[in-house]
Amino acid sequence: YTLSDTLSLHDALPIFRMTRRQLRLGAFIMATGHHIAAWRHPGSQIDSGINIDHYVDVARTAERGLFDQVFVADSPGVWHKGDEESFSRQGRLSHFEPVTLWAALSQATRHIGFVATASTTYEDPYLLARKFASLDHLSKGRAAWNVVTTSADTVHGNFGLGAHPDPALRYERAHEFVDVVKGLWDSFDDDAFVRDPASGVYLDPAKVHTLNHVGKHFRVKGPLNIERPPQGHPVIVQAGSSDDGKELAAATAEAIFTAWTSQAEAQAFYRDVKGRMGKYGRRPDELLVLPGISPVIGRTEAEAQGKWAELQALIHPSVGLATLVPFWPNDDLRRWNLDAPPPYYPEPPKGVNSRAHVVIDLARREGYTVRQLYEYLAGARGHWVVVGTPQTIADQMQDWFENGAADGFNVMPPVLPQSLNEFVDLVIPELQRRGLFRTAYEGRTLRDNLGLARPASRYAAAPAARAA
């Protein structure tokens, strides 16, 4: 194959990329780890939420393992529902704002992408567009935005609102929000900045575009005050399995984070969300489905089970009960018998995300006691927990990947940094041995490594509008 003189190696990467489909892997990190008792474990960094050296080490470990990206969840409020005792025993109360954190870590890494959560309910489109464009420039094309509408009904008080908006309104706003942000990222054509000292011309004003958006929720003039991001647009990620969430992903997202413990349910979700994309003029391969997996790794099955038992033994009952409060918000769970089933199964409260339906249905179907239910949620809040050897874990991942349940996974280490080190040292080589995962990064940007196309500007085929 002969490249034309104008086609760069960067542009040609999709031509030369291996044709065999391979896993996409993200490292989904939470301070001390995903298990609710992780901060008490000797393998954790106890002050990790505000320890930049810890995050540098974690990002470099993930990059050593050739992960596509690292991701931290975020909320514009404190993560807690429960009584004062559980509040005092909860290890996730203090943590960095993610875009700030990733801006710092982009200077300590070279290849790995950075996914930051930001809410379309409690952020502003112009400021968010500027923030993520800046991160994409700082990281040289490794930024991604995890679009959330914020399901927590405890946040509105931080923003002067009398109530948390209902889900339908939040998702309606989200669709418009994402469209505005993408339009702002296209404010400048890729070649708008001439920067020619000889002529004295810095910018071609014919290649600057004012958005002039007027919609139901936003009025945004533009242009943005930073040039087009290296990736065109930072990668758009979405997390949500409700019907509204699937529609938002089908319309706007390039990756979706989801939570399933059953392969059959994961397969149904995979077919459903990809099947919705055609009406938005999109192909199924333009969206990567990445379920969460929390691996507890041992060199033997007995060692892995022992590690899991050790973590479960660290759960204080008050912290365990606090994980159930979102599903039973109108009851005093301290009165419940921990070793009996919940006294009743409610309809999930308004505004609680789709995972609430999964959890309540599971508790009813399996006949879990209260203790068994919070122990089930303790590992990864309802995500898939796999306990076993590197070979067992690779078997499970391969099975889901090759049978239409996933395009890859969000790996959720139960304890940090210990569990991520184990995954990189033990599971990654097994996946590589099977040809399921890369042995080197393919490109320079997060889009390159995820196999996603760089989006054209919405103005590429239209006459340029002069900036006002």
Predicted regions located by residue number:
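Hydrophobic, small-residue-rich alpha-helical packing segments that form membrane-like cores
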Residues: G26, S44-D53, W102-F114, S119-Q231
